[in-house]
């Protein structure tokens, strides 16, 4: 029994791979035409399909939308009962139907023509009514389905998904869509956290900023270290310009060397030190800390004025790893 299950599973995968391997050679003028129509679309790409084609169509619409092409899915039956009103003349419709003869098309195609809406077809029958009505046809035909009964859409749905990915990626690259663009449409994801967050989004503010004046003593700085627990204190002049930092390490070295706690902190601090810009990308700031092997740093504004503080734990808590 187990061997039979494995054999069927492997055979299914082999058949799907075999059919999918024929797709690249089919890409030609129609693929380029479809991509250009989408690229020059001033509205949205409306993806539609019935049954398994509809399920794949939802994924294709989602992929387009997340890679720079506004898109949504509409079910053909819903389209014929009011949702055609969602589609405007500046939109493009991508209709998926393996047979290319879905009965809904008899009613949808004339309405698209009335509105001068460009129709793209993804079908296994390029000479079907759908294929003949479309401005570009993407051929997803298969010699056989992977289903042992040759009935359930299997190889054909894989081909549909792959053709949709190929189209979306070609359009994405042509748009110059980059990582930051992707992050803007995925703000809650790990990539969004890495690329969209700025230092000022994560930094500690107000009373949570460890700081003392240049005139403060080592004792004052030690108490501030203890209060904030950040591992450093920013030492600032009267204009809030950071002149140096006093760290846990500086304190240990000062005490081991016999330094007095009443000494001005500017004699014990690390002059200058690393500061981070509030408007910098958080991922870049984290890399600065990692490269310099420090765990925290003061944050300054464009004028060099102290405005916050941040440590590595703040990055990790924001999902920037």
Curated annotation (Swiss-Prot):
One Pfam family this sequence matches: SIS
Q: So what does this thing catalyse?
A: D-arabinose 5-phosphate = D-ribulose 5-phosphate
Kindly list the positions annotated as binding Zn(2+). Answer: 75
Site described as Catalytically relevant, positions?
52, 104, 145, 186
What's its EC? 5.3.1.13
Q: What domain of life does the native source organism fall in?
A: Bacteria
> Has keyword Metal-binding?
yes
Domain CBS, residue spans? 203-261, 269-321
Q: Which UniProt keywords apply?
A: ATP-binding, CBS domain, Isomerase, Lipopolysaccharide biosynthesis, Metal-binding, Nucleotide-binding, Repeat, Zinc
- Residues binding substrate, per UniProt: 68-69, 75, 81, 107-116, 141-143, 215, 267
Family per similarity comment: Belongs to the SIS family. GutQ/KpsF subfamily.
Quaternary context? Homotetramer.
Q: Give the protein's biological function.
A: Catalyzes the reversible aldol-ketol isomerization between D-ribulose 5-phosphate (Ru5P) and D-arabinose 5-phosphate (A5P). It is also able of sustaining the biosynthetic pathway of 3-deoxy-D-manno-octulosonate (KDO), a unique 8-carbon sugar component of lipopolysaccharides (LPSs).
Question: Per its UniProt record, what PANTHER family does this chain match?
Answer: ARABINOSE 5-PHOSPHATE ISOMERASE GUTQ (PTHR42745:SF2), PTHR42745
Q: What is this protein called?
A: Arabinose 5-phosphate isomerase GutQ
């Amino acid at each position: 029994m187990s061997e039979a299950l494995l054999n069927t599973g492997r055979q299914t995968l082999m058949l799907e791979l075999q059919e999918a391997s024929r797709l690249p050679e089919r890409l030609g003028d129609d693929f380029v035409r479809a991509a250009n129509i989408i690229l020059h679309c001033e509205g949205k790409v409306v993806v539609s399909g019935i049954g398994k084609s509809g399920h794949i169509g939802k994924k294709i619409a989602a992929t387009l939308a997340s890679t720079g092409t506004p898109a949504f899915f509409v079910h053909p039956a819903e389209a014929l009962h009011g949702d055609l009103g969602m589609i405007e003349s500046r939109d493009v419709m991508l209709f998926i139907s393996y047979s290319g003869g879905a009965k809904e098309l008899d009613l949808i195609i004339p309405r698209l023509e009335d509105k001068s809406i460009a129709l793209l077809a993804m079908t296994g029958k390029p000479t079907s009514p759908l294929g003949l009505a479309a401005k570009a046809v993407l051929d997803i035909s298969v010699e056989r389905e992977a289903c042992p009964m040759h009935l359930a859409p299997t190889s054909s749905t894989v081909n549909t998904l792959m053709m949709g990915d190929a189209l979306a990626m070609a359009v994405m690259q042509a748009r110059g869509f980059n990582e930051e663009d992707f992050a803007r449409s995925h703000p809650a994801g790990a990539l969004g956290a890495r690329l969209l967050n700025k230092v000022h989004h994560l930094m500690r503010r107000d009373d949570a900023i460890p700081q003392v004046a240049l005139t403060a003593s080592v004792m004052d700085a030690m108490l501030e270290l203890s209060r904030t627990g950040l591992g450093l204190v920013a030492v600032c002049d009267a204009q809030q310009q950071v002149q140096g930092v006093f760290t846990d390490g500086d304190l240990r070295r000062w005490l081991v060397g016999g330094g007095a706690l009443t000494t001005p902190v500017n004699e014990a601090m690390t002059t200058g030190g690393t500061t981070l810009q509030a408007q910098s990308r958080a991922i870049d700031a984290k890399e600065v800390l990692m490269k310099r092997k420090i765990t925290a740093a003061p944050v300054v504004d464009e004028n060099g004025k102290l405005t916050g503080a941040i440590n590595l734990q703040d990055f990790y808590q924001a999902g920037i790893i």
